[in-house]
Amino acid sequence: MATNYSANQYEKPFSPKYLQNWSLAKPTKERISSHEGYTQIIANDRGHLLPSVPRSKASPWGSFMGTWQMPLKVPPARATLTSRTAAGAASLTRWIQKNPDLLKASNGLRPEIFGKPHDPDSQKKLRKSITKTVQQAPSPTIIPSSPASNLSSPDQLQSSHPSAGHTPGPQSPLNSPKCPPGSPCLPHAGRNLAEV
């Protein structure tokens, strides 16, 4: 034991002389007054509840689900059905709703499901109907209000495509390097542009 040990060695800093608080001390009772009621013993000395104490069926932790109560694979919290087939989307939603305890738990899953699944059969039917309409398209006709309808030869027809005739593309001049002068690819070989 240390030679300079004193039982009240830590009391000196809290004395009024050092704290310099010269206020009056609070009056204390010689004997404390008794409280109303009594202490009910509900546990033994080891902290276990006595058998006479009524127990609640509910967990004291509420609906919290621990790691060992959770399923081995937890479904995703945000599921997108957009790029899935109808069977895949049904399987995913069944998996999410399979464990109701996980959905009800306070720390459980709050799933958000977005999008609609696509049906490959309806996609095939849609593609077939599109190809049928393309194959059954009417023959091309001349659009009278189109600026391109004032062509030099009447056998040049306009396309039935909606964008045809609205914005004509760049026209190559007759003396283009692709067709040499005097070749049969020109409609009027040897003529000037001013004559046509």
Swiss-Prot record:
Biased amino acid composition, Basic and acidic residues: 113-124
Known tissue expression: Expressed in trachea multiciliated cells.
Subcellular location(s) per record: Cytoplasm, Cytoskeleton, Cilium basal body; Cell projection, Cilium; Apical cell membrane; Cytoplasm, Cytoskeleton, Cilium axoneme
InterPro entries referenced in this protein's UniProt entry, alphabetically: Fltp
Keyword entries, A-Z: Cell membrane, Cell projection, Cilium, Cilium biogenesis/degradation, Cytoplasm, Cytoskeleton, Flagellum, Membrane
Region spans: Disordered: 107-196
A Gene Ontology biological process term: flagellated sperm motility
Biased composition (Low complexity): 137-149
Record's subunit section: Microtubule inner protein component of sperm flagellar doublet microtubules. Interacts with DLG3.
Family: Belongs to the Flattop family.
Protein name per UniProt: Protein Flattop
